[in-house]
């Protein structure tokens, strides 16, 4: 069994909890409070330290993509959806229908939404960039307010750089 490490990152839209194994990032999500189970940062694997560094660059508007090893598993369709999410450009959005089409099944809009919802690595796999076909912000595990913040942050970063 692989060792698991936990770290926290304070961002403007809220506290982020990151878990990593010895070979990659396992989860990254917004949380309300720190758990008592936390790792000593001296023992963090290189990719967890790198994740924190890349998040810092992202929130400073200096990073548009992430280059980190991820430990993810899901159905074939979920993996296709998550791969398509990573292709949505920084500062841009796509609809659930767009994602379903690119994942290979235009009729699987609801399934694409469910796969989006099952994403355990927020921000890095940018599920916040998916919006309704009507352009409305809907559903985000971190809350619609954070989704709006992230999208505005990305757009503002593009304008300011």
What are these language model-derived features?
Residues 85, 109-118:
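Major-groove recognition helix of helix-turn-helix-like DNA-binding domains
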Residues 68-70, 112, 137-140:
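Short clusters of hydrophobic/aromatic residues that line enzyme substrate/ligand-binding pockets
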């Amino acid at each position: 069994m692989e060792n698991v490490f936990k770290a926290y990152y304070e961002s403007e839209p809220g506290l982020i909890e990151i878990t990593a194994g010895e070979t990659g990032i396992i989860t990254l999500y917004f949380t309300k409070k720190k758990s008592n189970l936390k790792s000593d940062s001296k023992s963090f694997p290189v990719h967890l330290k790198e994740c924190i560094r890349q998040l810092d660059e992202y929130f400073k508007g200096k990073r548009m993509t992430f280059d980190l090893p991820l430990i993810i598993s899901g159905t074939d369709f979920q993996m296709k959806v998550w791969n398509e999410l990573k292709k949505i450009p920084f500062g841009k959005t796509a609809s659930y229908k767009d994602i379903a089409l690119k994942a290979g099944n235009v009729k699987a809009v609801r399934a694409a939404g469910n796969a989006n919802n099952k994403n355990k690595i927020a921000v890095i796999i940018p599920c916040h960039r998916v919006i309704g076909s009507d352009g409305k912000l809907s559903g985000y595990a971190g809350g619609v307010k954070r989704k709006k913040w992230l999208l505005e942050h990305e757009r503002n970063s593009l304008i300011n750089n």
